């Protein structure tokens, strides 16, 4: 035991029995005791999750994913939220960093997000078809994705975290993005957007 929770992906098999989704070689690399427990591929493929993990069954936690899409949830104002899928381009790779801000100065919130995961488990394809992209809000929960020629943002590595601020104090929102095994990049807003108003409070020594 390492104290780290391991994920066992499962799927419904014949007669609605739950079986591991990954091959023995993949899951065994994560949980080596399975090689001895299952014996061979034939026995493993015909076993249910409960049969394979009977000894650990009481300590397992079952979680269910209802969607793998990247979504926005709009507050309906009555205690309920409306789910809205982000554009198709966003669904090409997992999102690891996201920030909200008005990047074009039209008074409508936009998004900047970072994607990609090149380092995956054995047997899984890299999830690196995404990039860092800016989504311009329409004001109704829908967005237009700027291409690289429009935004000038070209980051195709494993983006992780983003931070938004007016780094050069010109009244426009900029952003910085960090990457796994890549350089941290700062992008200064060079658009013709309307400049924001900077408010500085300066009264007593207490609130300076």
Give short role names for the model-derived ranges.
Residues 1-208:
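Beta-propeller-forming repeat regions
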């Amino acid at each position: 035991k390492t104290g780290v929770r391991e994920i066992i992906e499962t799927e419904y098999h014949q007669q609605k029995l739950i079986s591991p989704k990954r091959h023995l070689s993949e899951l065994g690399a994560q949980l080596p005791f399975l090689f001895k427990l299952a014996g061979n591929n034939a026995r493993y493929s015909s076993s249910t999750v409960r049969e394979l993990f009977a000894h650990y069954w009481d300590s397992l936690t079952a979680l269910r994913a209802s969607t793998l899409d990247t979504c926005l949830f709009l507050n309906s104002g009555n205690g309920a939220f409306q789910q809205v899928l982000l554009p198709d381009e966003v669904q090409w790779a997992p999102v690891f960093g996201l920030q909200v801000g008005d990047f074009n100065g039209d008074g409508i919130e936009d998004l900047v997000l970072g994607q990609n995961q090149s380092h995956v488990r054995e047997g899984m394809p890299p999830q690196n078809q995404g990039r860092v992209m800016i989504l311009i809000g329409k004001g109704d929960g829908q967005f237009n994705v700027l291409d690289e020629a429009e935004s000038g943002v070209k980051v195709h590595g494993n983006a992780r975290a983003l931070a938004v601020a007016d780094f050069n104090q010109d009244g426009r929102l900029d952003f910085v993005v960090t990457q796994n095994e890549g350089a941290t990049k700062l992008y200064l807003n060079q658009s013709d957007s309307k400049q924001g108003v900077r408010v500085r409070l300066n009264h007593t020594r207490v609130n300076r």
